[in-house]
Regions:
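Enzymes that bind and transform nitrogen-containing heteroaromatic metabolites
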Residues: 1-159
């Protein structure tokens, strides 16, 4: 299981339930990386999806204690249920939001992090993998600039 996220300089991932700065390069990387995989997502993140519809070309698992069903999603009420469902999957990505990242990070062996260097005030955060002794930056896959905003797409592995 791996995590995929875009973070700002303070490792923030969002504000008021949305991603304040979204880069097309990050979205493209996300689509290419998760296509054909199983993705685990939280209810608040799904609320930000267009039409609250599942991501096409993926098996969509919704981790929610309040929702029991949502068309196109397999709904799990707890982490253990989601872990059981993904045991046989070839590729599993945790795609957010903050609560889902925190609950599933201990089960992840790797992470793809797009570092977006934009002046953003976040209210939701991902743990700082650079400061975590259990994680190691193993590669910078891409660097660039979009609309004056610098970014890097990085690969982390659990030690």
């Amino acid at each position: 299981m791996e995590l995929i996220a875009a973070v700002y300089d303070d490792w923030g991932i969002g504000a008021n339930g949305t991603q304040p700065v979204a880069l097309s390069a990050d979205r493209k990387f996300f689509r290419q990386t998760t296509k054909g995989a199983t993705v685990i997502v939280g209810r608040r993140t799904v609320a930000d999806f267009p039409g609250q519809k599942p991501l096409p070309g993926r098996v969509n698992i919704l981790l929610s204690q309040s929702l029991r069903e949502l068309p196109g999603f397999t709904v799990c009420s707890d982490v253990q249920q989601a872990l059981e469902l993904t045991k046989a999957a070839d590729s599993v990505f945790v795609i957010g939001g903050g609560s889902v990242y925190r609950q599933l990070l201990p089960h992840c062996s790797g992470a793809y992090i797009t570092k977006v260097h934009a002046p953003v005030t976040s209210d939701t955060f991902l743990p700082d993998l650079d400061a975590d002794p259990n994680w190691k930056l193993t590669a910078t896959l891409e660097t660039g600039e979009e609309n004056g905003i610098a970014y890097e797409i990085c690969r982390y592995q659990r030690k």
